[in-house]
Amino acid sequence: MKIGIIGAMEEEVTLLRDKIENRQTLTLGGCEIYTGQLNGTDVALLKSGIGKVAAALGATLLLEHCKPDVIINTGSAGGLASTLKVGDIVVSDEARYHDADVTAFGYEYGQLPGCPAGFKADDKLIAAAEYCIRELNLNAVRGLIVSGDAFINGSVGLAKIRHNFPNAVAVEMEATAIAHVCYNFKVPFVVVRAISDVADQQSHLNFDEFLAVAAKQSTLMVETLVQKLAHG
């Protein structure tokens, strides 16, 4: 099995990259892909860059060049569920765009023409992630993760997301684009991210302060999940 892992930022991939043995680097289209073994399991780790276009481009390059069997999207996210705090884990059961609107033509808010309203994560990957959460004794929430090309930092953007997606547990900038590409390629995916901030007016300050905490927690989760997927 080869496992694809995607993070947007240097801070989100550096701890995992340092653990990859026999590492080789491919630089293509503004993305970096690191291949090798993580605790004996073949992995391809992508640093995509921030935002939906960068994530979609990188995910496509990763799938085409490395042919992973599954995709794990890792990194940080803004918490929307009331029980979440910095360092907690969110696991996707679905991903949707929060900034797409073609409702004038009868589509659901967040749905693009020719696409489902949301992109469902793989049940087996979700179950494996939840097993790892129990093993690591982490606080986590599973649910809808929404994505858009905006850092949510205040009441207006937050209120709009809560209105359109009242069940969303987290918000970030890449996951749905990655899920969209995986859907088109028919490759199973799951989003496993750690909370770096609560999406409020102080979120930009919290993000800068707690990104390292989120990166450490998400790395722990991904490393454990890779082991679980490879060895059962």
UniProtKB/Swiss-Prot annotation:
Show the Pfam families listed in the entry. Answer: PNP_UDP_1
Q: What is its EC number?
A: 3.2.2.9
Q: Name one GO cellular component term.
A: cytosol
Q: Which InterPro entries does this one have?
A: MTA_SAH_Nsdase, Nucleoside_phosphorylase_d, Nucleoside_phosphorylase_sf
Any one GO MF term held by the record is: adenosylhomocysteine nucleosidase activity
An example of a Gene Ontology BP annotation on this entry? Answer: L-methionine salvage from S-adenosylmethionine
The active site annotation covers 12 (proton acceptor), 197 (proton donor)
What keywords does the record list, in alphabetical order?
Answer: Amino-acid biosynthesis, Hydrolase, Methionine biosynthesis
- Which CDD domains does this chain map to? MTAN
Pathway where it operates: Amino-acid biosynthesis; L-methionine biosynthesis via salvage pathway; S-methyl-5-thio-alpha-D-ribose 1-phosphate from S-methyl-5'-thioadenosine (hydrolase route): step 1/2
Per UniProt, substrate binds at: 78, 152, 173-174
Q: Which reaction does it catalyse?
A: S-adenosyl-L-homocysteine + H2O = S-(5-deoxy-D-ribos-5-yl)-L-homocysteine + adenine; S-methyl-5'-thioadenosine + H2O = 5-(methylsulfanyl)-D-ribose + adenine; 5'-deoxyadenosine + H2O = 5-deoxy-D-ribose + adenine
Q: Does the keyword Amino-acid biosynthesis apply?
A: yes
Please give the function described in this protein's UniProt entry.
Catalyzes the irreversible cleavage of the glycosidic bond in both 5'-methylthioadenosine (MTA) and S-adenosylhomocysteine (SAH/AdoHcy) to adenine and the corresponding thioribose, 5'-methylthioribose and S-ribosylhomocysteine, respectively. Also cleaves 5'-deoxyadenosine, a toxic by-product of radical S-adenosylmethionine (SAM) enzymes, into 5-deoxyribose and adenine. Thus, is required for in vivo function of the radical SAM enzymes biotin synthase and lipoic acid synthase, that are inhibited by 5'-deoxyadenosine accumulation.
Quaternary structure, per UniProt, is:
Homodimer.
UniProt record similarity statement: Belongs to the PNP/UDP phosphorylase family. MtnN subfamily.
- Give the protein name, as stated in the record: 5'-methylthioadenosine/S-adenosylhomocysteine nucleosidase
Which species is this UniProt entry from? Salmonella arizonae (strain ATCC BAA-731 / CDC346-86 / RSK2980)
